[in-house]
Amino acid sequence: MCGIVGVVGNRNATDILMQGLEKLEYRGYDSAGIYVINQPENGRLIKSVGRIADLRAKIGIDVAGSTGIGHTRWATHGQATEENAHPHASATGRLVLVHNGVIENYLQIKENYLAGHNLKGETDTEIAVHLIGQFVTDGLSVLESFKKALHIIEGSYAFALIDSQNPDIIYVAKNKSPLLIGLGEGYNMVCSDAMAMIRETNQFMEIHDKELVVLTKDTAQVSDYDGNPVERQAYTAELDLSDIGKGTYPYYMLKEIDEQPTVMRKLISTYANENGKLTVDPAIVKSVQEADRIYILAAGTSYNAGFASKSMIETLTDTPVELGIASEWGYNMPLLSKKPMFILLSQSGETADSRQVLVKANAMGVPSLTITNVPGSTLSREATYTMLLHAGPEIAVASTKAYTAQIAALAFLSKAVGEANGKKEALEFDLVHELSIVAQSIEASLSEREVIEKKVANLLATSRNAFYIGRGNDYYVAMEASLKLKEISYIQCEGFAAGELKHGTISLIEEGTPVLALISSSETVAAHTRGNIQEVAARGANVLTVVEEGLNKEEDDVVVNQVHPYLSSISMVIPTQLIAYYASLQRGLDVDKPRNLAKAVTVE
């Protein structure tokens, strides 16, 4: 949520800031702004509500400089107005600050330190920059004022600060909110994630919590809040411009849906050698082996991926699996088993709720595994172990390829653990071969997109609500399918276990209600689901069926190629991703940037 970009050095700051903010749009925002300066006390501060294009329209050709900071804001404290948009200036206008996160004690700071200050907006960020500015007015240097403020401020934050009297420096600090340094020749950058800087550099440096960076065009000096130097090595990001472009696609979401066969094959090459032998880190395998219960913690789509994998993990490892919503566990962790193992699923690796659980797990000495798409992310750094999805950047807010990659990664982990345990089911499960078949199944489903588009036009284009139903793993896919549909089409959609219809939900079925039914698994389960279809059809529902090959009938709408039952959640979800995409498209909505949503939820 929100995004920061900053640059100091021999670059056109305005161009870099605007390009960076455009690359951060996927994180979600409702306003944006930049501050650019070239000579002391000659900066320009420009803000707007709405899209980055609205901000660009306000920027004249005379707005230039070699140092600048920019920000996309998602309203938390205060409404989406220009007054509340970032950057914010201190009382004298000397200091300018951008901030991501939530300052928990901002009201106490206002009461204790800022009596008499005329605040223009309603944000916690403005209070932070006024606090730093007050210490400068009291006689401290900007650096010492920044340090003093950091010792007072509580909560999550990523800060980038410019002193207009000395514009060759950007002061940076973070706690519980993502921030990276980008390193160039004669210039340096700061940003919320690497994608916003990849046009300028692929050399990055991590900032850990409660660290401060003094950034100039030639140096990035890292220290703790007391001024003690910290050594930090740079790393090279495995990104290039083609990874973050749409190419010929109208939307990132469609591109990312189409990339899923490639992602499956990439995971095969990552976690298995040329002979098909798995190469999952033995230390991870041993840690899972030693657990008497696996706890999967996640949010949103990642939570659904965990549910879709639960039965497979239990069957292959012979270890019970419990799912937890990270935002609930952070405040209400249940009684754990004697030898727990936490697995945290997060596409971004920055999910604040999951991080709160991880902090508690670390404090209790519980081993943890992060499965994420972003190397160097907070969860990957702080967990005991990490497995990467290698899915490439996922920019559309609605997650698609990360969901299927998470299930595949959990399959590799489960088979590796099961093999180590001598479990028959794991030894007989040829995952490399079966996942190759899944990749082919996905390609077959993608080739049917025109059929799906027409079905959606007839069923969902004008609907206000809809239901997904399924049994077994199809129920878990229904949960993800309903989330995807509501996220980007704004159709009120819920996923239900088909057998629960008669226990309340069927009362909502009326003439014309769309019901989308998922059928895979066994003939017995399929027969029961078809019975539920008859029940809703008898009450006027318009039904669309997605059925696995071998269980299909002539009247079914979408047929999915048959795959191994352990992996059916991957193949069955593909048509539902396309259904959501076309429903959003046909309703004239922005598929990649649904309202009120952010890609990475970095505040609780």
Curated annotation (Swiss-Prot):
Pfam families: GATase_6, SIS. GO terms for cellular component: cytosol. Residues 284-423, 456-594 form the SIS domain. Its main location: cytoplasm. One of its GO terms (biological process) is carbohydrate metabolic process. The active site is at C2, K599. It is found in: Cytoplasm. Homodimer. NCBIfam families: glmS (TIGR01135), PRK00331.1 (NF001484). This is Glutamine--fructose-6-phosphate aminotransferase [isomerizing]. It comes from Streptococcus mutans serotype c (strain ATCC 700610 / UA159).
